[in-house]
Swiss-Prot record:
Mapped zinc finger ranges (CCHC-type): 355-372, 378-395
GO cellular component: viral nucleocapsid
Source organism per UniProt: Human T-cell leukemia virus 1 (isolate Melanesia mel5 subtype C)
Keyword vocabulary terms for this entry: Capsid protein, Disulfide bond, Host-virus interaction, Lipoprotein, Metal-binding, Myristate, Phosphoprotein, Repeat, Ubl conjugation, Viral nucleoprotein, Virion, Zinc, Zinc-finger
Miscellaneous field: HTLV-1 lineages are divided in four clades, A (Cosmopolitan), B (Central African group), C (Melanesian group) and D (New Central African group).
GO annotation (BP), single: viral translational frameshifting
SMART domains noted in UniProt: ZnF_C2HC
Motif PTAP/PSAP motif mapped to chain: 124-127
The protein's name: Gag polyprotein
Keyword Ubl conjugation: yes
One GO MF term: zinc ion binding
Amino acid sequence: MGQIFPRSANPIPRPPRGLATHHWLNFLQAAYRLEPGPSSYDFHQLKTVLKMALETPVWMCPINYSLLASLLPKGYPGQVNEILQVLIQTQTQIPSHPAPPPPSSPTHDPPDSDPQIPPPYVEPTAPQVLPVMHPHGVPPTHRPWQMKDLQAIKQEVSQAAPGSPQFMQTIRLAVQQFDPTAKDLQDLLQYLCSSLVASLHHQQLDSLISEAETRGITGYNPLAGPLRVQANNPQQQGLRREYQQLWLTAFAALPGSAKDPSWASILQGLEEPYHTFVERLNVALDNGLPEGTPKDPILRSLAYSNANKECQKLLQARGHTNSPLGDMLRACQAWTPRDKTKVLVVQPKKPPPNQPCFRCGKAGHWSRDCAQPRPPPGPCPLCQDPTHWKRDCPRLKPAIPEPEPEEDALLLDLPADIPHPKNSIGGEV
């Protein structure tokens, strides 16, 4: 019997180990744009491909979905190829911003590039997270929250600060799948965030709603009541989605955890691989920085300053102290911690004492090295002999009977009154 993969009931499938959360959320965003929608089998196949691709992480620095698609085996089952095509199209649609050329001097030629000076950093063209886009297969009516759905969402954002990229992208995915009303969003906010965060979000949302009502929104009727009331109508899909965008935008004004940078104390261990250390930094910044804060300069700075001394020497020697993250990872890719040889510290042996040993009375050795056995503290309690211990007492040893001589035992088997026959040449027998 083959394994049956139903449609995914969990709003946020678990990411494979070793993949950053914001990268996994990009794959989910692309998967939910497919028509028909993804199933659990598609997510299972996607995780299998990513686990194999993570063994050669050259496509991640920076992330290159075209290179990842080339690693996909031909005729791979599931909708993995379609998911990668959506990511490739989204990546190519974003225009790149080329760096301005350096000013040229007409008098002299530019000097040769110094290998010790790192090249200028070029911003990656790939977006950190994909924007929310509702797929064509959105149901006409929304799905109300269930307790298992709220618990799954809260588990995903438990380690992320409100307003961080991981928090926002997780909420975007939940909004995209369930298409909640204003009442559902309020319930979600109260379930996920504290009362202080909910109060700050409510204030920011009120100001955004007032501005939107003044500006005018497609489908909004001022005579039908406030925008919050009209967004509760399940039939008003367009107006409800406008309210969802305002509700998500209100998180941008929340104070993130960047004031207390716990990620600044993340240091590379003496024997920790460099790519593992960079991945820990990446995850910590995703969970701590507010949305919109540039992460790459902070990540590159910490990837050098918080590395161990051996990796810092490698980066300095190759001029990658402020280079793109991919160059830094390649510089320390072949680094392995040095084998720490254990030095055996031999304690010098003390010279023999001049005093006589208290056991045998001879000089030249310590009492612990004396060949004479230790004398008993008193007489034996069994036989009162002061020359041996109780364990050596002959009374404790069982008496072994002496074996009888073999000749006597043989003689006992012979009869005593049988005459010995006499043989003679002419006589009687």
